[in-house]
Amino acid sequence: MSAQQTNLGIVVGVDGSPCSHTAVEWAARDAQMRNVALRVVQVVPPVITAPEGWAFEYSRFQEAQKREIVEHSYLVAQAHQIVEQAHKVALEASSSGRAAQITGEVLHGQIVPTLANISRQVAMVVLGYRGQGAVAGALLGSVSSSLVRHAHGPVAVIPEEPRPARPPHAPVVVGIDGSPTSGLAAEIAFDEASRRGVDLVALHAWSDMGPLDFPRLNWAPIEWRNLEDEQEKMLARRLSGWQDRYPDVVVHKVVVCDRPAPRLLELAQTAQLVVVGSHGRGGFPGMHLGSVSRAVVNSGQAPVIVARIPQDPAVPA
């Protein structure tokens, strides 16, 4: 990654759930590998104020707002306790001497826009995930899926407990399809593999058809071989610059004529980290999270970093 990016810190969002503590541990270790600051945050939504045109209902609204202010005060106090506990988890997951680089903070605002705006100024935002289609907690519910669509930088989604547990030498896996976000994913994946001292598996699944669809094409064997050679050369070209920059990383190239999601899910079962672009072939900046990225995140099989190219437009509330 660029010098500017590697000097930026990491932010982890918490909500007090067990899987958010897992995310804190992962973020603390990643921040330590990068030797950057870690910021533990919880975002508390603001108190709702009376909209215009409610004058005749204002007295009733005042009573509701009083109750909400009391509840909001409780949520703020609870948030401080959650951040304090998460801060302790981060310290325990880090080596001695890191205390000054780990801070905690309660923020006030709409959750997704707040975290998305923070993502402009940090190397990565980290959130926890329960896996198997269930996202944990109020903060980590729709927030995870919304943030990976609106963030201005990488978002790491960490499952509570990858199944089965991965050994320290498990590889990093990256999906490469030629899109701009997969190029950013390659940069992140090489950097992570280098810092972890593990191999990198680069997957290029070059078709959107499944294996059962190909017999209908009636292609000659030489046509298949030529196409496979072309795809292998394409992957080699896209990785060559990164291999020159990270000569310590052993790269295993996997080129298959298949849909990318099933192959990434297969590789994720033995990976310690999967890196994917926020959208792939045919994608464009600002579109919803791609089907491949969504499938890998939802599987909960391994921590996933979703690479997202920064966007200029304001984040919707």
Curated annotation (Swiss-Prot):
Effect of loss of the gene: No visible phenotype under normal or hypoxic and normoxic stationary phase growth, nor in mouse- or human-derived macrophage cell lines.
Domain of life: Bacteria
Bridged cysteine pairs (disulfide): none
Induction per the UniProt record: A member of the dormancy regulon. Induced in response to reduced oxygen tension (hypoxia), low levels of nitric oxide (NO) and carbon monoxide (CO). It is hoped that this regulon will give insight into the latent, or dormant phase of infection.
Sites where the protein binds ATP 2: G175, D208, G277, S278, H279, G280, R281, G282, G283, S291, V292, S293
Keywords: ATP-binding, Isopeptide bond, Nucleotide-binding, Ubl conjugation
GO cellular component: peptidoglycan-based cell wall; plasma membrane
Site of covalent link Isoglutamyl lysine isopeptide (Lys-Gln) (interchain with Q-Cter in protein Pup): K88
GO molecular function term, any single one: ATP binding
Binding site for ATP 1: G13, G128, Y129, R130, G131, Q132, G133, A134, S142, V143
Keyword Ubl conjugation attributed: yes
UniProt family annotation: Belongs to the universal stress protein A family.
PANTHER family: STRESS RESPONSE PROTEIN NHAX (PTHR46268), UNIVERSAL STRESS PROTEIN RV2623 (PTHR46268:SF27)
Protein name: Universal stress protein Rv1996
Lineage: Bacteria, Bacillati, Actinomycetota, Actinomycetes, Mycobacteriales
